Amino acid sequence: MEIKRKVVCTSTGCIEYAPERYRQLGIDIIRIHVLFKGKEYLEGLDLDPDAFYKELETLEDPKNNLPRTAMPTEEEIKACFDRAYEEGCKEVIVIALSAYLGGTWNLIRLVSEQYKDKMTIH
């Protein structure tokens, strides 16, 4: 019997540069939040790279106005795992930045504990 698997990547994995490819392969994305100029964006979804870089070039006080990132929410991670489970997946392989570079991996690991009776999350 074949085990159905799903690959999940955080948007920090640069996979967003080939969206047609990750969609074709069935890879899901857990998106990082970008905070910039008083607005919040989901990386790779509602933040156009060209517009973003143009905005960076015109910052009046770059030292104090640089963009910041924030982790995805627990609900966003659960929604991703729920979709995988509903698709019949028994295993999920998550590709994310190191736990030493931010809190996203640790949050993913904590959320994955809630699914240990349903599927294996690596």
For the regions a protein language model found, what residue spans apply to each?
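Short, contiguous clusters of charged residues that form electrostatic/catalytic patches at enzyme active sites
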Residues: 75-79, 106
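Short glycine-rich or small-residue beta-strand-to-loop segments that form or flank ligand, phosphate
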Residues: 91-98, 122
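Short, intrinsically disordered, charge-balanced linker/junction segments flanking boundaries
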Residues: 116-122
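N-terminal glycine-rich anion-binding loop in soluble enzyme alpha/beta folds
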Residues: 4-76
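Glycine-rich phosphate/diphosphate-binding loops that line cofactor/substrate pockets in enzymes
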Residues: 1, 78-90
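Residues at the starts of beta-strands that form the adenosine-phosphate
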Residues: 4, 91, 118
